[in-house]
Amino acid sequence: MSGTSLDGIDAVLAKIGPNGETVAEDAVSLPFQPELRKALFELQSPGANELHRDKQAGNALALAYADAVKQLLAKSKLQASDIAAIGAHGQTVRHQPQLGELAYTHQTLNPALLAEKTGITVIADFRSRDLAAGGHGAPLVPAFHAQQFSSTEDIAILNLGGIANLTLLPANGEVSGFDCGPGNILMDAWIYEHQGNTFDENGNWASQGKLNITLLKNLLADSFFSKAPPKSTGRDDFHLAWLQEKLGNENHPLEDVQATLLHLTAHSSLEALARHAPQTQTLIVCGGGARNTALINLLKSKSAEFFKHPLKITTSDTEGIDPQLVEGLAFAWLAWAHQQKRPANLPAVTGS
């Protein structure tokens, strides 16, 4: 798995039982080589020789995935023959679900090369069929969240990857979910632009700045936030150029922008949860953002602004799952579901 944040590759060894119960047996995380990260980042925007660059990057990503798989097998003392399949998501470089019958999504990857280099069956291209059926092709993880986290109380899962998405799991009711806005994507882009770091560790830089309320209101005025589900988003909508347009010609302190982006993620996530599932009792956070201490603390302190009752906020660690591994586990589970000929997209989530 490599997500929108472009921070690297997570490879998870998943043991899946006959009813879909899933356990992470082992994992490795590898940072992207700078050349590959640059190639994938540049594909996020139209440019010259795009088709050739996309195919080259897809091959390079397959080789990087293969290296991660081999390292995981060596760490786990397993052989390729011990593995039923690889669920490989690829790197999303375009996501255009709003184009009707011409809607498309594109995840750069050469799955054939990955299969050849590992000797393992590869299951990929998870999103296209859902778009063909009229859906958004995203988010896909709510079906897995329902498998892993369902409870006797009303809970929600907030996945804070590059994009933030919510899965709503009422104790008695239909599972639903949707993308709710930027997760780490803008904070990562801003700190990379100005400090060369790929992410803001623990939200330390954001913690040095102050919230700019006027800027926050300007960011929240984007039409995406007021759209009703089903909805999905990505780097097509939220990117550095979008942010710079919102900033205009004003000379904001850099750390204040980072602090405001932290508030944007927290505010948009809590507001969406309060609007669509005000009865939620527990919010479980996963994804890379779960390791951002400042973001978790902000979610906890701001929750009282949106909920009349105390909202318990925790991370998936409390459920025995490393927050960084949840999405990788989800795509292993989706690959298993495909092999079982079990539909794993949820029309109530994707709109298909």
What is each model feature region?
Residues 6, 263, 314-352:
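Glycine-rich phosphate-binding/hydrolytic loop that grips phosphoryl groups
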Residues 23-60:
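Conserved non-catalytic scaffold segment of RNase H-like nuclease domains
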Residues 1, 82-87, 155-159, 177:
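Short glycine-aspartate micro-motif
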Residues 64-72, 254-279:
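Phosphate/ATP-binding catalytic cores across multiple sugar-kinase/actin-like superfamilies
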Residues 93, 280-302:
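Glycine-rich phosphate-binding loops at beta-strand->alpha-helix junctions
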Residues 48-109:
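Short beta-strand-loop/turn "lid" adjacent to the catalytic site in phosphate-handling enzymes
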